[in-house]
C-alpha cells in the first residue's frame, strides 16, 4: 500500500499485516536442499556453520544434543585405534550435522596406526568416488588420499552426498525461542515498561503542557523507570486523558507460552524425556519415574544410535566401535 502523506491533520493511519504464507506454496529454506557442484567437490545443501550456531541458540537443543553425546561416550568401549576423546568428537559431529568423518593414519609400512575424527563442518565430498577435501576460509584446500576417509551420514530423501541432522525440523522453533528471550532482554534493558497508549482529548492542556507530558513519558524509559506521572488539568473532562496498556501483561503471557511450546517441539525432535534434561514439571504429578524413563530411552533411542555409529566397523573390517550395555550404575573412569 502507498505510504500515507505526512502532516495530514486529523487523518487516521492504518496498515495491515501480510496474509499467512503456507509452507508448501513458498520457496523457503528447504527448497534449496541440493548439493551444488563446486569444481572438485560438492557444497553442503545447508550452511554447516549456521547449524553449529543454531545449537547454541537454545538451551534445550544444546543440552539435548550434549546429553546424547554423553550417553554414547559413556557406553563406548575404548579401542587402541580410537580413544574416548576422539569418539566424543565423532559422536558430536554426527548428532549436530547428521554426518561425521573418520580418517586413517597409516604408517610408512602400511600399518594402521590410529583413527582420528575430521571436523564435519569443514569437510567436503569430492566429485570422484572416495575423494574428500578439507575446506577452511583463508586456507588452501586439503585433499585426502583416496580411501583414507570414511563418511558416516544420516540418510536423506533429497540427496545422497551429505547427511542432515534429525533435528533440522525444529530450527524455526529454536530460533523463535531465542528471539523471545532476546526480546525479553531488550524489554528489561531498555526499560520499555511504559507500554501503553496515552489517549488525550481534553482541550484544556496548552501546547507547552502537552510537550512537558510528552517529555515526561519519554524519560520514563531506560534506567530508573517505573516513575509515577502527575497530570494536573483543571476543569478537564472525565475521559479527556485515558491510559490504555498494551504490552506488559500480554508480553509476559506470550513469552511464557512461546518458551513452553518451542521447548516441547525441541524435546519431541530429540526424543528425550524431559526429566532426563532436568526440566521442572509444572503439574503436581510430575513426569514419573526417571529410572523408568532412562531405561526406555536407552532401549528405544540410544541403542539405534549405537548401531548407526557401529557401521564404521564395516569400512574398517574389524570391531573398533563397540558399546557396553547401558545401566544406571556409575561407570568407572
List each model region and its residues.
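Short, well-ordered loop/turn elements at secondary-structure boundaries
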Residues: 96-98, 108-111, 129, 192-193, ...
Amino acid at each position: 500500500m502507498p505510504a500515507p502523506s505526512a502532516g495530514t491533520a486529523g487523518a487516521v493511519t492504518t496498515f495491515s499485516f501480510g496474509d499467512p504464507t503456507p509452507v508448501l506454496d513458498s520457496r523457503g529454506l528447504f527448497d534449496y536442499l541440493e548439493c551444488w557442484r563446486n569444481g572438485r567437490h560438492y557444497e553442503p545443501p545447508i550452511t554447516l556453520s549456521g547449524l553449529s550456531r543454531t545449537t547454541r541458540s537454545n538451551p534445550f537443543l544444546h543440552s539435548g544434543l550434549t546429553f546424547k553425546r554423553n550417553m554414547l561416550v559413556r557406553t563406548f568401549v575404548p579401542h587402541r585405534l580410537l580413544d574416548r576423546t576422539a569418539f566424543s568428537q565423532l559422536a558430536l559431529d554426527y548428532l549436530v550435522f547428521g554426518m561425521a568423518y573418520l580418517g586413517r593414519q597409516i604408517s610408512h609400512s602400511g600399518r594402521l596406526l590410529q583413527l582420528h575424527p575430521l571436523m564435519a563442518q569443514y569437510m567436503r565430498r569430492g566429485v570422484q568416488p572416495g575423494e574428500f577435501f578439507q575446506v577452511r576460509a583463508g586456507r588452501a584446500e586439503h585433499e585426502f588420499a583416496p580411501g583414507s576417509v570414511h563418511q558416516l551420514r544420516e540418510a536423506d530423501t533429497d540427496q545422497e552426498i551429505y547427511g542432515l541432522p534429525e533435528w533440522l525440523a525444529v530450527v524455526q522453533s529454536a530460533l523463535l525461542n531465542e528471539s523471545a528471550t532476546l526480546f525479553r532482554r531488550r524489554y528489561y534493558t531498555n526499560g520499555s515498561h511504559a507500554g501503553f497508549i496515552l489517549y488525550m482529548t481534553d482541550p484544556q492542556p496548552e501546547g507547552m503542557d502537552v510537550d512537558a507530558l510528552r517529555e515526561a513519558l519519554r524519560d520514563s524509559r531506560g534506567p530508573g523507570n517505573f516513575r509515577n506521572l502527575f497530570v494536573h488539568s483543571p476543569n478537564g473532562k472525565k475521559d479527556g486523558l485515558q491510559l490504555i496498556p498494551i504490552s506488559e501483561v500480554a508480553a509476559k503471557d506470550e513469552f511464557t507460552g512461546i518458551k513452553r511450546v518451542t521447548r516441547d517441539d525441541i524435546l519431541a525432535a530429540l526424543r528425550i524425556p524431559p526429566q532426563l534434561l532436568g526440566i521442572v514439571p509444572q503439574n503436581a504429578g510430575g513426569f514419573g519415574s526417571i529410572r523408568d524413563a532412562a531405561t526406555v530411552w536407552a532401549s528405544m533411542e540410544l541403542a539405534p544410535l549405537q548401531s548407526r555409529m557401529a557401521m564404521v566397523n564395516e569400512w574398517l573390517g574389524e570391531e573398533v566401535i563397540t558399546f557396553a550395555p547401558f545401566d544406571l550404575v556409575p561407570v568407572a573412569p
